[in-house]
Amino acid sequence: MISEAPPFWWRKADWRAWLLLPLSFLYGRIAGHRMAHARRASVPVPVICVGNFTVGGAGKTPTAVTIARAAKAKGLKPGFLSRGYGGSLDVTTVVDPDHHRAIAVGDEPLLLAQEALTVISRRRVEGAARLVAEGADLIIMDDGFQSARLAIDYALLVIDSTRGLGNGHIVPGGPVRAPIGQQLRSATALLKVGGGNAADRIVRMAARAAKPYFTASLRVRGDNTLAGTKVLAFAGIADPAKFFRTVESRGAEIVVAKSFGDHEHLTEEEIDDILTTAEREGLLIVTTSKDFVRLSGHHGKAARLVEKSRVIEVDMVFEDHLAPSLIIDRAIVACRERRLREMKAGVKAIPAKAEPL
């Protein structure tokens, strides 16, 4: 997985994208074939996959959280399934936000575990079995759309309206993960985030393919006004510029902005530089939830940075507030239909009463 997309991916295709076109073609053929022909394990509960068309952040994690909250409101017990990218653990693990650190399980799983049961696993079939064994009656996959080894009942693809598909080329010449046609065929619906127009082309393609789409926006949680405040903003996420725009939308003046790689753990020198610069310039330090959990649980300067930082938390808010509940209902119906087909075909699902792995 690429942790930081090259800037040229998000501009009009230039000589680099065209030079890499043969590799993009080969990558696309392999990725498309895997999506179309992968053997997928049967799961006895509904599976919702929150993915995206491209490498990088589009808002998958806050979308997954919003769906989980809607599931809990319906009396369900949702469980998140994550690969645990950025963490060192290579065994299927139930994430404990009070015990684990991001360096072990990854930053996104720690955030998800604050909302609902969360399992990390490099082997998604094994992770799904663990969630079922732990009592989950709805599985929400955070990413994994292009490489899923599970039967998916509802695939929601999130697309950022300011970035869209970037230059439109497939990795490594651009940010697209697999041929768009194959991705659309495998998708159930799209979620367009924000009010930009960069995603309009893919939305029109989805409409022609009879795929519904929802709209949503990222909203700052709580009263996080920063009017007139001079800040040092730092972010190690896929799209730091989006975070900086959010900070400025709260009325802050960003005097210093520091960007790091997605999922990157800061070095002692980088932490010291942030603290020293903020103290020297008299700046408030602001950061993202992901960066905050990566720093949490450490000692020394990292602990001091945690103490000094204000976290800007965001929620994914659907324009139609009933949409998350509708997505869950559709997934439940699709799961029932899938299980009937599987039973007729003699396909066995992951045991509903499996022993913990």
Curated annotation (Swiss-Prot):
ATP binds at residues 54-61. Coiled coil: none annotated. It is an enzyme of class 2 (transferase). Its EC number is 2.7.1.130. GO terms for molecular function: ATP binding; tetraacyldisaccharide 4'-kinase activity. Pfam families: LpxK (PF02606). It comes from the Bacteria. Pathway: Glycolipid biosynthesis; lipid IV(A) biosynthesis; lipid IV(A) from (3R)-3-hydroxytetradecanoyl-[acyl-carrier-protein] and UDP-N-acetyl-alpha-D-glucosamine: step 6/6. InterPro entries: LpxK, P-loop_NTPase. It catalyses: a lipid A disaccharide + ATP = a lipid IVA + ADP + H(+). One of its GO terms (cellular component) is plasma membrane. Keywords: ATP-binding, Kinase, Lipid A biosynthesis, Lipid biosynthesis, Lipid metabolism, Nucleotide-binding, Transferase. One of its GO terms (biological process) is lipopolysaccharide core region biosynthetic process. SUPFAM superfamilies: P-loop containing nucleoside triphosphate hydrolases. The keyword ATP-binding applies. Belongs to the LpxK family. Transfers the gamma-phosphate of ATP to the 4'-position of a tetraacyldisaccharide 1-phosphate intermediate (termed DS-1-P) to form tetraacyldisaccharide 1,4'-bis-phosphate (lipid IVA). This is Tetraacyldisaccharide 4'-kinase. It comes from Rhizobium johnstonii (strain DSM 114642 / LMG 32736 / 3841) (Rhizobium leguminosarum bv. viciae).
